[in-house]
A protein has these predicted regions:
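Structural scaffold elements adjacent to functional motifs in cytosolic proteins
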Residues: 47-49
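Rhodanese-like catalytic fold shared by cysteine-dependent sulfurtransferases
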Residues: 2-6, 19-39, 45, 54-87, ...
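Short, surface-exposed ligand- or partner-binding patches at beta-edge/loop junctions that are enriched
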Residues: 91
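Bacterial N-terminal signal peptides
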Residues: 9-18
């Protein structure tokens, strides 16, 4: 009994730490292609491509602006070029960088949705891009 109580007391803080790091605490919405397309049909939604300038030039979603999340100036650029009173819909190639960007922006007071699996899922669903 005493051993079980000690085990329980020691494991509780670890479980709290693990649960606090789960995706349930995301401050943004990760959406599929259809939801993303519906969101950006609203012209007040700002569309942000967080890939490199080279990737952006290869093809991007209409109305998107490009701010590379891997640069040291991403946060400053986003705060300068984006309006916090309007939702930001963002994407990258596969979803990894956009999740990082979504976290940064949401922590800075932006309302954010991100395209799950990135522009790859967009093009795989036969959606258009522009060069």
């Amino acid at each position: 009994m005493k051993k079980s109580l000690v085990t329980l007391l020691l494991s509780t803080p670890l479980m709290c730490l693990i649960l606090s790091c789960s995706n349930d605490n995301m401050n943004y919405m990760s959406v599929d292609v259809e939801e993303f397309e519906a969101a950006i049909s609203d012209t007040t939604v700002q569309v942000l491509d967080v890939r490199t300038a080279e990737e952006y030039m290869e093809g991007h979603i209409a109305r998107s602006i490009n701010i590379d999340v891997k640069t040291d100036t991403f946060e400053v650029g986003a705060n300068t070029r984006l309006d916090k009173s309007h939702t930001v819909a963002l994407y990258c190639r596969s979803g990894r960088r956009s999740k990082k960007a979504a976290e940064i922006l949401s922590n800075n007071g932006f309302k954010v949705i991100e395209l799950n699996e990135g522009i790859t899922s967009w093009t795989n669903n036969n959606k258009t891009t522009i060069k």
